[in-house]
Design a protein with these regions (language model features):
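A short, highly charged, low-complexity intrinsically disordered segment
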Residues: 144-154
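Active-site core of glycosidic bond-cleaving carbohydrate-active enzymes
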Residues: 1-98, 137-140, 152-153
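CBM-like carbohydrate-recognition segments
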Residues: 97-144
Length: 154
């Protein structure tokens, strides 16, 4: 199941990662569905906030799942896992280059996550911590991902 999810993300990479990884839901609700379900909440218009916005703090969850899968199953689908590793590296560098300049914004709007969210708060703890966790797991202590293994017996 996990590898099927990884393949799905790769297949939809352009939409889910785009310029600011990672989109919170895909596809976003269209105008009619948005009006009916949210009462035309301006924060949740299509491609924004919880309706297709990009939330950088989500990347560490996804990255950790890839790294943990590599630890658990080092010989499983090596080609796929190589592609997934390359994807999280690319996303990491994207965030490293953008987030400090964009004041660690909470979320990003638009089909590609190009714009800082219309009501986004800056210097968000979860944005900063999410990036630092991804950095820690990729660069500092990769084995620390094992702390997140819920199937491991202690």
């Amino acid at each position: 199941q996990q590898r099927a999810l990884f393949r799905l993300v790769l297949h939809n990479r352009e939409h889910l990662m785009a310029q600011m990884p990672m989109r919170i839901c895909h596809p976003p609700m269209d105008i009619d569905e948005w009006q009916n379900k949210t009462g035309s909440d301006p924060k949740n218009w299509p491609w924004s906030y919880h309706n297709g916005g990009h939330w950088p703090s989500l990347l560490w969850f996804f990255g950790a799942s890839i790294l943990l899968h590599e630890k658990r199953y080092p010989k499983a689908d090596v080609l796929l896992m190589g592609q997934m590793r390359a994807l999280i590296e690319e996303c990491y560098w994207s965030q490293l280059n953008q987030l400090p300049r964009q004041k660690w914004a909470e979320y990003f709007d638009g089909p590609t996550g190009t714009w800082v969210g219309q009501q986004s708060r800056t210097y968000q703890t979860w944005t900063i911590v999410g990036f630092l966790l991804m950095h820690h797991l990729l660069r500092a202590e990769p084995d620390d991902v094992l702390m997140l293994d819920l199937e491991e017996e202690f």
